[in-house]
Each structure stands twice: as structure tokens, then as C-alpha cells.
Amino acid sequence: RPPGWSPFR
């Protein structure tokens, strides 16, 4: 997972 990833988006 890359930095700044969002599990909600």
C-alpha cells in the first residue's frame, strides 16, 4: 500500500 492510501476511498 502506497503512503496516503485511504481504506475508505
Curated annotation (Swiss-Prot):
Disulfide bonds: none annotated. The keyword Secreted applies. One of its GO terms (cellular component) is extracellular space. It is found in: Secreted. Keywords: G-protein coupled receptor impairing toxin, Secreted, Toxin, Vasoactive, Vasoconstrictor, Vasodilator. GO terms for molecular function: toxin activity. The keyword Transmembrane does not apply. One of its GO terms (biological process) is vasodilation. It comes from the Eukaryota. Plasma. Induces smooth muscle dilation and contraction. Intra-arterial injection induces a significant decrease in ventral aortic blood pressure of between 5 and 10 minutes duration followed by a dose dependent increase in ventral aortic blood pressure of between 30 and 60 minutes duration. May target bradykinin receptors (BDKRB). Belongs to the bradykinin-related peptide family. This is [Trp5]-bradykinin. It comes from Amia calva (Bowfin).
